[in-house]
């Protein structure tokens, strides 16, 4: 995303006033239990919704993977919110932000598909019962209502993103009506979300309560932990943000793109901060980015440990290992609840050290005869430092490519996290003019992103660099699930050119920033928590993490498996699931946030996969009879299919004549019948499911010439 595009984006609706009836009760809890009457009404509505639910509504990726059925009500939940590896029939539903329901859009929108889901009702769940699976302990069948009133002197915890998925991390802690937020990141869209730039946490449940937020604490500077901060600040711009030096620098740069000046407060591993009822102590954590912090959050309800993203690298490049002694001291104090990184809980053993990568890079770069291009995550300063050291040892200059890489390395060099001899780092323009064996390029594009620098090089579309036979390409990163096709596509294009591509499968050019199961056991044994809540992972990771906690002595009933929106209350030293709030996705699309829902994504997918058929029929407004033959236009069809569109025209004409013979002259009902018949015909004939867009225009028999304005006006009226 370029700078101008970022600056142009805006929040479509700012934080609104308190809920109706609460104007004079600003200290009411964020969530309250519905009264009995509203509960009964909600149950009835839910039952009706289940009876009429579209089959696709029941698909929820993560729970399907566990063999459990989805018990969510179609009226207030979105499908497939828990698994990144989803098909087009198992897409996440978006949460609308327009404050009004759109359940009837499928019927009222003349251009919509006939059998689409409806049901996004805005961010508030007022009075509705949100039925989901309970993920507490081994119980996967209990249905959860909306949570009751927050317990007095109890700690409430819920995630608005980042649990049951990897990305858009955001966890809220609530004590006595005050809120503390930990992290605020983004998730990047999958192929099932066309046209979406970013996916944000759902701010809806706290949007009207942001005045109660005492601070936003950020564990580290990765996009899935800081990327949504500018969007949150558009709802309240003075939230204090606590983070380490390097993390704050990345946040400041990101907010500058949005023309924001956030309230930034620097902390480190020795800091001890009081924010409202929350006492926050910090401890050093090792990850794949500098200055990571773990949290120890203390309230009268107890002590909570949040690991953030963590690994146990015993020989870290910066000499700053994860502070296990500090974690052990917290354990001596008594840890009531531990939120632990689950990303690599399914991988046995321990992860490798970043120090193990440096010798491999030095050898590969030293042996290379032509240009070397290394692709890495733009925030992995340690990896970039190892690459720069390898280039210096081989008498090569280094150039950074990719906007995020250039920005992050400028920050890292300015703050002293990246070190290179004077004159080593040069511009891309200078690099393009040098002999290939004298240059090393460090670029973005490890995941095959179409517009990333490495992908453009592979397609030979890069403005400054042309990859040649004999060049060495090092992919120094992990392969994110779901990106395999894109990454292998880039590798194949580079191989076709004649370049040599080295990945983590070929040599030790990458190590994970997340601890394996053996490292998580160390964490649990050091902290000795009474309760555990796995976070930062998909369901397979969360369940594996649960078993690790149990193996170290945590009572099975005290391990809480939650997904986004599940509310956990910690009272008297026991953490329990008490309900769930509606949490969906906020999509950033162009200049807006949140105006996309499941229907829009379904339309975009149908357009991309099935094409478009547009039918315009002009009828006598009294008799309903056609005044001229229907006009059919198509988009996205092959020439062979277009040649058969005469059949579509004939069917349209027959359908309209039959309806008129039955006395039908209502354009809306005619549109519905026409769409239904054409959809069935096209699917049977060509095995396609295009967007069918019929338009029926009522006119007097004397007026048969129809202009574009009349067609447009008729579509809008329908």
From Swiss-Prot:
Q: Where does Zn(2+) 2 bind?
A: 224-225, 309, 536
Name of the protein: Ribonuclease J
Which superkingdom is the protein from?
Bacteria
Note describing how the cofactor binds: Binds up to 2 Zn(2+) ions per subunit. It is not clear if Zn(2+) or Mg(2+) is physiologically important.
Q: Which Pfam families match?
A: Lactamase_B_2, RMMBL, RNase_J_b_CASP, RNase_J_C
Q: Enumerate the residues binding substrate.
A: 510-514
Q: Where does Zn(2+) 1 bind?
A: 220, 222, 287, 309
What task does this protein carry out? An RNase that has 5'-3' exonuclease and possibly endoonuclease activity. Involved in maturation of rRNA and in some organisms also mRNA maturation and/or decay.
Q: What EC number(s) would the UniProt record show? A: 3.1.-.-
Q: Where in the cell is it found?
A: Cytoplasm
């Amino acid at each position: 995303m370029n700078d101008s595009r970022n600056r142009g984006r805006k929040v479509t609706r700012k934080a609104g006033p308190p809920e109706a009836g609460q104007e004079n009760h600003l200290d009411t809890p964020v969530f309250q239990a519905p009264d009995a009457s509203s509960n009964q009404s909600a149950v009835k509505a839910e039952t009706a919704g289940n009876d009429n639910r579209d089959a696709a509504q029941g698909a929820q990726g993560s729970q399907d993977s566990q063999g459990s059925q989805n018990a969510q009500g179609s009226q207030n939940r979105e499908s497939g919110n828990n698994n990144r590896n989803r098909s087009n029939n198992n897409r996440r539903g978006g949460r609308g932000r327009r404050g009004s329901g759109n359940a009837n859009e499928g019927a009222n929108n003349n251009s919509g598909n006939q059998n689409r889901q409806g049901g996004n009702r805005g961010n508030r769940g007022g009075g509705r019962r949100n039925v989901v699976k309970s993920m507490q302990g081994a119980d996967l069948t209990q249905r959860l209502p909306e949570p009751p009133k927050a317990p007095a002197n109890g700690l409430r915890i819920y995630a608005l993103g980042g649990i049951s998925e990897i990305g858009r991390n955001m966890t809220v802690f609530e004590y006595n009506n005050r809120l503390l937020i930990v992290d605020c990141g983004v998730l990047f869209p999958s192929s099932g979300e066309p046209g979406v730039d970013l996916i944000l946490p759902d701010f809806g449940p706290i949007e009207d309560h942001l005045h109660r937020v005492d601070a936003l604490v950020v564990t580290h500077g990765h996009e899935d932990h800081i990327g949504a901060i500018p969007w949150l600040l558009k709802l309240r711009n003075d939230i204090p943000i606590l983070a380490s030096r390097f993390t704050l620098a990345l946040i400041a740069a990101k907010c500058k793109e949005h023309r924001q000046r956030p309230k930034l407060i620097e902390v480190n591993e020795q800091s001890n901060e009081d924010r409202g009822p929350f006492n926050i102590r910090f401890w050093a954590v090792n990850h794949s980015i500098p200055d990571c912090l773990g949290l120890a959050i203390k309230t009268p309800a107890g002590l909570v440990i949040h690991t953030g993203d963590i690994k146990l690298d015993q020989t870290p490049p910066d000499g700053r290992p994860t502070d296990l002694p500090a974690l052990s001291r917290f354990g001596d104090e008594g840890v009531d609840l531990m939120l632990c990184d689950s990303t690599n809980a399914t991988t046995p053993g321990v992860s490798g050290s970043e120090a193990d990568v440096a010798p491999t890079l030095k050898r590969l770069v030293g042996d290379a005869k032509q240009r070397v291009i290394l692709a890495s995550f733009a925030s992995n300063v340690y990896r970039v430092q190892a690459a720069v050291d390898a280039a210096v040892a081989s008498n090569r200059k280094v150039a950074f490519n990719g906007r995020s890489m250039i920005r992050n390395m400028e920050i890292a060099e300015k703050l002293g996290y990246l070190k290179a001899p004077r004159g080593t780092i040069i511009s891309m323009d200078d690099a393009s003019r040098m002999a290939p064996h004298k240059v090393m390029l460090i670029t973005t594009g490890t995941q095959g992103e179409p517009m990333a620098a490495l992908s453009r090089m592979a397609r030979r579309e890069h403005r400054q660099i042309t990859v040649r036979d004999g060049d060495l390409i090092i992919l120094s990163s992990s392969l994110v699930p779901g990106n395999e096709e894109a990454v292998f596509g880039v590798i194949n294009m580079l191989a076709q050119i004649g370049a040599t591509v080295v990945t983590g499968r070929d040599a030790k050019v990458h190590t994970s920033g997340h601890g394996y199961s053996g490292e998580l056991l160390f964490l649990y044994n050091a902290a000795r928590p009474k309760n555990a809540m796995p976070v930062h992972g998909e369901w397979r990771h969360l369940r594996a993490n649960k078993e690790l906690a149990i193996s170290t002595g945590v009572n099975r009933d005290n391990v809480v498996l939650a997904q986004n929106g599940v509310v956990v209350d910690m009272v008297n030293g026991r953490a329990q699931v008490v309900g769930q709030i509606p949490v969906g996705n906020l999509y950033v699309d162009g200049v807006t946030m949140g105006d996309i829902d499941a229907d829009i994504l379904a339309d975009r997918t149908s357009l991309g996969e099935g094409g478009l058929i547009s039918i315009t029929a002009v009828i006598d407004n009294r008799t309903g009879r056609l005044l001229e033959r229907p006009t059919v236009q198509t988009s996205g069809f092959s020439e062979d299919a277009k040649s058969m569109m005469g059949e579509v025209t004939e069917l349209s004409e027959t359908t309209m004549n039959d309806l008129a013979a039955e006395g039908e002259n209502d354009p809306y009902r005619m549109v519905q019948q026409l769409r239904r018949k054409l959809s069935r015909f096209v699917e049977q004939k060509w095995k396609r499911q295009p967007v069918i867009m019929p338009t029926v225009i009522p006119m007097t028999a004397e007026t048969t010439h129809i202009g574009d304005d009349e067609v447009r006006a008729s579509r809008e009226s329908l």
